[in-house]
Amino acid sequence: VIVLDTNIILALLDKKDAHHKNAVGIIEDLGNERVYVLNTNLSEIYSVIARRCRERKYDCKEALGKLKELEANINIIWLENMQEIHAELADGVIESNGELNYNDVLLLKFVRDEEAKLITFDKQLKVENQRIRGGQA
């Protein structure tokens, strides 16, 4: 299982993103591999795109509409029963001294538990992902 972080999708959709070309290359390199996004990351993507549109005075409906269209080609993992793991996630944010946000801790927990591959541009997430895997990417 390959899981994409929020920043990969954002960079893919936003041609002005510093990582746009890298994101396109990553997706092209994956070819026909099935990739997944957690529903929590999807909600984060919607929020960031809406904010960027407002800041840049772009048409939010058009940009968000493109994201909704992209959903048809993304495998979304719908996490439920978050109440059961909330304390663990909150502790992860606290233990990282705020270096990781709640969604980051959730994403790391998922890739650890499911032995999934994480693709991200976030250096801190990469470091933490390697740490929890015992040095393996």
Task: Kindly give the residue locations of the regions a language model identified.
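Acidic, PIN/NYN-like endoribonuclease modules and their adjacent C-terminal/linker elements
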Residues: 1, 78, 84, 108-137
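Short, well-structured N-terminal submotif of metal-dependent ribonuclease cores
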Residues: 1-37, 52-65
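Acidic catalytic patch
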Residues: 15, 39-43, 65-96
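Amphipathic alpha-helical repeat scaffolds of TPR domains
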Residues: 46-47
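Conserved glycosyltransferase catalytic-site signature
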Residues: 6, 102-105, 122
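Aromatic- and histidine-enriched alpha-helix N-cap/loop-to-helix transition segments
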Residues: 37-43, 102, 106
